[in-house]
Amino acid sequence: MSCSKSVIKEEMLIDLHLEGTFNGHYFEIKGKGKGQPNEGTNTVTLEVTKGGPLPFGWHILCPQFQYGNKAFVHHPDNIHDYLKLSFPEGYTWERSMHFEDGGLCCITNDISLTGNCFYYDIKFTGLNFPPNGPVVQKKTTGWEPSTERLYPRDGVLIGDIHHALTVEGGGHYACDIKTVYRAKKAALKMPGYHYVDTKLVIWNNDKEFMKVEEHEIAVARHHPFYEPKKDK
C-alpha cells in the first residue's frame, strides 16, 4: 500500500460546513458523519444553523454532501483509486447542476484531511429557480440511483451524470451534473474511463428539514463491454 493510501483508514470521520445562497437567500449547514471508504458507504447528520427553515426542497443539497467525497467509493483493483491517493493533501471539486426548468446550482468543495477525519468546505449557489417549480414548491421526494461517467482530461478528472429527482404525484425532474475533480498533489496517476454507481437516500429528517440524516452507497466499475487496452 502506498503512503498516500495508507492515511485512509477502514473507517473515517466527516466534518463539514456549507455556506450558500438560493435565489438570494443566505443559509449555512454544519454536519458530521462517518463512513467506510473501501466499502463505499458513508452517513452524515446535517443541521441548518443559519437561514432556516430553507425556502426550497432539501434534495438539491444532497449531492453536495454525499457525492461530495469520492474517497467514499469502492474501487475494484483494476480501476486506479485516484482521489484516495490524493490524501493527505486532498483535492477540490467544482460542480454545475443544470435543471430542466432553468434552475442552476454552482458548487465548490475543498476536501482536506486531519488525522482520521475528512473536512469539507462547501460553497453553494442556487439561481434562477422558478417560484412555481418543484424545488421552490418543495415537491421533490428523492434522487433516483445514478451512474456517473468519469474520465481524465488535461490533468483533472471529469464526471458527468444525467440525473433525475422524483416528484410528488409521480414523474421526474431532470438534471445534468458536471464535476471537475482536482488533486492538490501533483503527478498522480489518473484512472481511465470508468463509471461510479451511486444510491443516495435520506434516512431521517424533521418536518422542516432543519435536521437531516443521509446515507450513500457508491461503487466504481467498468462498462460490461470494457476491454483492457493491450500494450503496443
UniProtKB/Swiss-Prot annotation:
The keyword Repeat does not apply. Keywords: Chromophore, Luminescence, Photoprotein. There is a cross-link at residues 66-68 (2-iminomethyl-5-imidazolinone (Gln-Gly)). The keyword Manganese does not apply. Transmembrane segments: none annotated. Fluorescent proteins have become a useful and ubiquitous tool for making chimeric proteins, where they function as a fluorescent protein tag. Typically they tolerate N- and C-terminal fusion to a broad variety of proteins. They have been expressed in most known cell types and are used as a noninvasive fluorescent marker in living cells and organisms. They enable a wide range of applications where they have functioned as a cell lineage tracer, reporter of gene expression, or as a measure of protein-protein interactions. One of its GO terms (biological process) is generation of precursor metabolites and energy. It holds the Pfam family GFP. Contains a chromophore consisting of modified amino acid residues. The chromophore is formed by autocatalytic backbone condensation between Xaa-N and Gly-(N+2), oxidation of Tyr-(N+1) to didehydrotyrosine, and formation of a double bond to the alpha-amino nitrogen of residue Xaa-N. Maturation of the chromophore requires nothing other than molecular oxygen. The precise stereochemistry of the tyrosine has not been determined. The modification 2,3-didehydrotyrosine is found at residue 67. Oral disk. Pigment protein that is green in color. Belongs to the GFP family. This is GFP-like fluorescent chromoprotein dsFP483. The lineage of its organism: Eukaryota, Metazoa, Cnidaria, Anthozoa, Hexacorallia.
